[in-house]
Design a protein with these regions (language model features):
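Extended hydrophobic leader/signal-anchor segments used for secretion and membrane insertion
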Residues: 1-109
Length: 109
């Protein structure tokens, strides 16, 4: 099964404040093309399975340096160094508000 090019991201925590706030929802686009300044979803190198949202601040050879916009509240490349390209899963593109959950009514019931 093919992967969709977009995936939802729920922001949790304050490491990206004031740019992103906890509770916001964003769509991220899977892409190998990222650049300095992009806000990306990163597979956290210190904790397998943990995804974080950080800003790319510089390129370090073939790897990327990622940091939170709120340095006092962010665990990022300042702690664990640059991340591999494969650790960057996508780039945040657009903020959205999820619709409230509703049941689909049955017909003729």
């Amino acid at each position: 099964m093919a992967r969709l090019p977009w995936f939802p991201v729920a922001v949790a925590g304050d490491s990206m404040e004031p740019t992103l706030r906890s509770g916001e929802w964003w769509l991220a686009r899977r892409s190998d093309r990222v650049t300095v300044g992009d806000v990306v979803v990163v597979s956290q190198p210190e904790q397998v399975g943990l995804l974080t949202v950080k800003r790319i601040t510089r390129r370090d050879g073939t790897r990327w340096w990622v940091e939170g916009d709120n340095p006092d509240r962010s665990r990022d490349s300042r702690h664990y160094g640059p991340v591999d390209q494969e650790a960057i899963l996508g780039r945040l593109v657009v903020r959205y508000r999820p619709l409230p959950l509703r049941r689909i009514p049955r017909r003729g019931g």
